[in-house]
């Protein structure tokens, strides 16, 4: 009997400790949750600037998606694959080449630096998109005026 109570208590402790790893927030209807953020694929094609503006209008802290890890990359690729028609070749991310003080640097539209890189090809174009030919797992730089669907991301509000 004592062993049963001990094991039951241990399982309860494990369950409670795991319950705070991402399941303690809710995203709005139509949004998907991953690692403390909410994501949504927007199918209506827009140029990069209009897509970023749209994302910032959806929620506080909203931006085009930044991808900070392989796990997040896989999540976003699956989300895009499930929601984008087969005719779409590219999907905007928040990746943008900035020309600051005559030095090119790449950063995300939310202001974070690029800590995880997964570029397929680096062209002299300024805006980053996911590439269909790679299952939306790799990024390519495109001209920012091109019209593409996109992914928005925001931290949920408490």
Swiss-Prot record:
InterPro entries: C-type_lectin-like, C-type_lectin-like/link_sf, C-type_lectin/snaclec_domain, C-type_lectin_CS, CTDL_fold. Disulfide bonds join 27-38, 55-152, 127-144. One of its GO terms (cellular component) is extracellular region. Expressed by the venom gland. Pfam families: Lectin_C (PF00059). Residues 34-153 form the C-type lectin domain. Residues 1-23 form the signal peptide. Keywords: Disulfide bond, Hemostasis impairing toxin, Platelet aggregation activating toxin, Secreted, Signal, Toxin. PROSITE patterns: C_TYPE_LECTIN_1 (PS00615), C_TYPE_LECTIN_2 (PS50041). One of its GO terms (molecular function) is toxin activity. Its main location: secreted. It is found in: Secreted. Belongs to the snaclec family. Agglucetin specifically causes platelet aggregation and surface exposure of integrin alpha-IIb/beta-3 with a GPIb-(GP1BA-) dependent manner in washed platelets. It binds to human platelets in a saturable manner, and its binding is specifically blocked by anti-GP Ib mAb. It regulates endothelial cell survival and promotes angiogenesis by activating integrin alpha-v/beta-3 signaling through FAK/phosphatidylinositol 3-kinase (PI3K)/Akt pathway. Heterotetramer of the subunits alpha-1, alpha-2, beta-1 and beta-2; disulfide-linked. This is Snaclec agglucetin subunit alpha-2.
